[in-house]
Amino acid sequence: MDNEKQASPPPAAPPLNWRYLLWIILLGIFLISWLGNAGRQAGDEITYTEFKQALHQGKIAKVTLEGQHISGTYHEAGGNIQPEGKDSKGFSTTRPPFDDPELMKLLEQKGVVVQAKSEEPSLWMQAIIGILPWFLILGLIFYVSYRMQQRMMGGGRGGPFGFGKAPVKRFREGSIGVTFEDVAGVENAKRDLREIVDYLKEPGQFKAVGAKIPKGILLVGRPGTGKTLLARAVAGEAGVPFYSISGSDFIEMFVGVGAARVRDMFKAAKEEAPSILFIDEIDSVGRARGTGLGGGHDEREQTLNQILGEMDGFAAHENVVVLAATNRPDVLDPALLRPGRFDRKVVLDLPDKKARQRVLEVHTKNVPLAADVDLERVARRTVGFSGADLANLVNEAALLTGRERKKEVDMDMFNLARDKIVLGAKRETILGEEEKKLVAYHESGHALTAWLLPEADPLHQVSIIPRGMALGVTEQAPEEERHSLSRAYLLDRLGVMLGGRISEKITFGDVTSGAESDLKQATQLARRMVCQWGMSDKIGAAAFSRSEEHVFLGRELSQPRDFSEQTAQIIDDEIRRILSEVERKTENLLQENRAKLDALAKALIEAETLNLVEVEKIFKNVKELPQEGHNEAVATGAG
C-alpha cells in the first residue's frame, strides 16, 4: 500500500487564506479614503470662474472652506449655473494656487455664511495612520515565519511555534498492509526479526525465561535490498503502532530543533507502547562524533546525543523497539552500536538466484504474464540486482508492454527492460563509417578476449548501438554469484577490460580516448589487487589502504598514510607491472586470433548487435591465417 494513504500524521493547522487577508487590507484602504472624503459636502463640480460669477449674482447661500477646496449650497430660488439648466442644491470647486484677497470681502458683502475646516486629519485618522504601518510590518514578519515553518515542517505542522514537533508518520494497527509474505529473498533477516514480532505479540512467554526485548535493531544493507520494506513488515506482523521518520528530518537551521524532535518522537512512541519506531537513513544523524567539518558542537551531534540518551532511558515496561536502517554502518558512532542500544544487527545481502526468482514472483503478482515468460531465466540473467532493481525491471517491462499496445508482458519485454537498465537506453546517434569501424573493432576486442580467456565471465552479447554514455557495449553474464575472486579471474578480467584498446592498437596502429573508462576501471582493480588483496609477490601478504573517505561522511579531516614513500613507489611499480603483463598477453592473444577479430568486427558493422550464439557461429567459420602471414597482415595494418 501507499505510505501516504496509510500514514496518519498529526492534524495540521488550517492554512491561512492570504487572498482573504489581501481583500481585507484593500477594503480597509477604501474605507479610510471614503471616510476622509465623507466630511466634504457632495455637489456638482464647477469651475472657480463659475463660482465667482454665482457669488456676484448673489446665488450662493453658504460655503465651506477646507484648504484649497470650496464647497457650498445655492439659495433655493437660485439654480446651478450649468448649460443644461439642471437644478442643484450644492456645488464644489477648487481655488487657484495663488491668493485671492477679494474673495472674503465678496463673501461678506453678499451675506454668505462662511464655514472653515482644518486641513489636518481627525484624531482617529491620525491614530490609524500611526498604527497601520506597524501592523503591516508585524504581518510581514509573521508571514515570513509561517512560510519558513511550512517548508521545514511539511505544511505548518505544530502551529507557529511547532518547530520541535517531529514530522513523524504514524501508521495505525492493521493499516500497514505489508507482512513477511510480501518480503522475499531475505529469509535470514526475516528469521531474526520474527523473534521481535513474537515478543511484541506474547511478551509473557519471553519474560518467563528472563529474556528482554532488544532496544534497537540495525538493518544494514546496500540500497534497494528492502530495509524499509522489512521494517514495515515487522510492524504489519506485530500489529502495533508504527512510527516512521527519516534521519534528515531531525536537522534544521535552528539550534536545538533536532534534539527537541527526538524527545517528541520518543514521547509519542512511549505513550502507545508496545510500538515500533523506525529511523531510516540513520547515518545522517548517527555519524561518529568529534569528526568531520562540524567539530564537536554541531547540531547533528546534539541530536545524536539525545537519541543515545532516549535509548538509555527506556524502562523495563516500555516495549518500544527502535528499528534503524543504513547503508553506511562504517560511519556510525561506536556508542550507537554498543549492546543496550542497537543490540542486534541484521544484514541484508543482495539476493541470490533463488531469492531473485521469489522476488520476481512477488512483484509480478498483479502483472499479466505471457506463456513464454520464465522467471527462473530472468533471475539467472539478473546477477547483482537488488530487490528494488528487480521491482524496477518488472515495471519497465510493463511500461514497454503498454507502449507496444500489448495485453501481456512477454519474455522479449523483460529482455528489453533488462538491457535498458544494465546497458542504458538506446541513443539516436549516427556514427560515421570510420568511427563505426573503430567502435566495432574496440567492442570486438572486448568480446573476443571474453570468449578466449578461460576465467573470464561468459560473453552474452556485443553491440555497437550507442547506449547511455557509451558508443558500444560488450556484456558478460556470469553464470552464478561470485563471493570470492581468484587471482586468475581478476587477471582475465583485466584482460577483457584492456581488450578494446589493444584491438584498436593492433588494427589501426593508434589508440583513442574511447578506452578512458576501461583504463580507469583496470587501474582501480589492479590497485586493489596490490594494496588490499595481497596479490603481488613483491608486496606480499600485506594491506596498504589509501583512504578514499570524504570529510562530510564523518571521518577525520586528515588520515595519515600508513606506509612509506618507498612502499608507495613499489605499489605504483607493481600496478604498472600487472597492467603491462596483462596488456602484453592480451595483445599476443588477439594477434593469434586476428582472423576471428576481423570477422567479428565485420559482422558487427553489418548487424550492429550479436548474441553469444551468433558470435560462436562466426568463430566456427573462421580459419586462422598462418603465423607468418598473420604477422605481416598486422604490420601492414599498423602502418
From Swiss-Prot:
Pfam families in alphabetical order: AAA, AAA_lid_3, FtsH_ext, Peptidase_M41
Q: Has the keyword DNA damage been applied to this entry?
A: no
| Periplasmic side, ranges | 37-123
Provide the protein's localization: Cell inner membrane
Task: Name the cofactor(s) required for activity, per the record.
Answer: Zn(2+)
Q: In the record's cofactor note, how is the cofactor described as bound?
A: Binds 1 zinc ion per subunit.
Residues given in the record as ATP binding sites:
221-228
Cytoplasmic topological domain ranges are 1-15, 145-639
Carries keyword Membrane? yes
- Looking at the UniProt entry, the stretches that span the membrane are 16-36, 124-144
Catalytic residues, chain numbering: 443
Instruction: Write out the entry's keywords from A to Z.
Output: ATP-binding, Cell inner membrane, Cell membrane, Hydrolase, Membrane, Metal-binding, Metalloprotease, Nucleotide-binding, Protease, Transmembrane, Transmembrane helix, Zinc
**Highest taxon of the lineage:** Bacteria
Q: Tell me which Gene3D superfamilies the record gives.
A: 1.10.8.60, 3.30.720.210, P-loop containing nucleotide triphosphate hydrolases (3.40.50.300), Peptidase M41 (1.20.58.760)
Family annotation (PANTHER family): ATP-DEPENDENT ZINC METALLOPROTEASE YME1L1, METALLOPROTEASE M41 FTSH
Q: What does this protein do?
A: Acts as a processive, ATP-dependent zinc metallopeptidase for both cytoplasmic and membrane proteins. Plays a role in the quality control of integral membrane proteins.
* Descriptive protein name: ATP-dependent zinc metalloprotease FtsH
